[in-house]
Amino acid sequence: MHKHKQNQCKRKVKHRKNAMKLIIFCITVGIAFMFAYYQNLRKEIDTRQKWLETVLTEEKKWILENQGPEGEIYMNGSKAGDVNPYFACIAALGLLAETKNCSMTETEKKAVGRYLDWHTGILLETDGKMGIYRKENGKLIYKEKADSEDGYLGMYLFLMGKYLEKTENTDLPEFWKKGISLALKKIQSLMQDGITQVSEENTTVYLMDNLEVWKGLYELELAGMEDTQAISEIRKKIQDQIEKIFWDDANQRWRIIGNSDLYHQAEFYPDGIAQIYPLIYEFPVKEKKKQKVLYDQFTERFQWQKLNKKRTGFLWTITGMAAAQMGDINNLVELIENYETEYYKERKYPLYTGEAGWICMECGKLYELYERKIKIFKI
């Protein structure tokens, strides 16, 4: 009986040893597998990031080629044709985009500074009423009125704030300070109940314009201006009102126009694009889940990443910014690949420098998403 118990004990010890060996073996194999997977992932991401830096460099180069002698940035090639300050601001924002191994150059920094000189000069000259300009006989001529004063002012402040943040510049030219002050006063004059209207003559309030104004104020606030407190108060007013005025809770979607439930599901612009505009401009929606639903619906309905439908005369590369916010790497990669395939060499219509600006920013955002992916895996 005693001998039988001893044998049982020996068998248990042997089983335990075997079990431990198996566990150690499995852990070793698992670690080896994970290490190999990480190495392959790192290699794949390195390749992707180098590609993004190549695209970023080439797009910046093209934008720079389209800057005029006074700092203005033209919409498309040959330094001729139209200068639209709204889209020029986006092109200049593209020049500020960078990655870990592809920093903003001194040339790019100076180009954005020159553009801000030009834009601010026109802003002060027109008392904040920017227009669209055309080059005729070597001179820029006022062509037509801007379609939304509030949106144009918002994009100017967006660029100004981002430039000051990136360059850490605190010693602003005096006329820049005047330009910023004028833009802020104009925005306040267009505000009704915490929301901006299109212009003094047009009292319509648009979701997209207000998000652009909010973004401009937000970036200017981040830059740490002297009157940050005043900027913050205006920004908070708009932020508080955007969801109250524009969110249609009954239909679970964004209104395009304040107090109007008109919506055409099949229309890409403005109906569809408005649903992802808060994502594009990084607006802090209170319930993030609802924005994900709208993004998924937009992607399924319009297949924006394919870039195969020219809507209202634009490529709408801006859509990739929403993908970046959602961490949608695959669709963002597809968008940039399709853009590169279709427009990289020929730069054909309807490509504008503003579209290239969004691509630059998206290259930077996608690079960051890859960095985050590696960090998460390491943890």
PLM regions with names:
Residues T105-E108, V112, P173, I231, ...:
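Solenoid-repeat scaffolds in large eukaryotic assemblies
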Residues D46, C89-E106, G154-L172, E212-D227, ...:
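Well-ordered alpha-helical scaffold segments within catalytic/enzyme domains
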Residues N40-I90, A97-N137, D171, K177-Q188, ...:
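Low-complexity, Ser/Thr/Pro/Gly-enriched N-terminal "stalk/linker" regions
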Residues K309-F314, I318-F377:
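Fungal-biased detection of long, low-complexity, Ser/Thr-
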Residues Q8-C26:
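N-terminal Sec-pathway targeting helices
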Residues T54-K60, E70-Y86, A146-D150, E174, ...:
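Extended ligand-binding clefts on enzyme/binding-domain cores
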Residues G131-K143, Q192-T203, Y343-K345:
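Acidic/His metal-coordination segments adjacent to aromatic residues that form catalytic metal sites
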Residues S232, K289-F302, N331-T341, K373-I379:
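Alpha-helical repeat scaffolds
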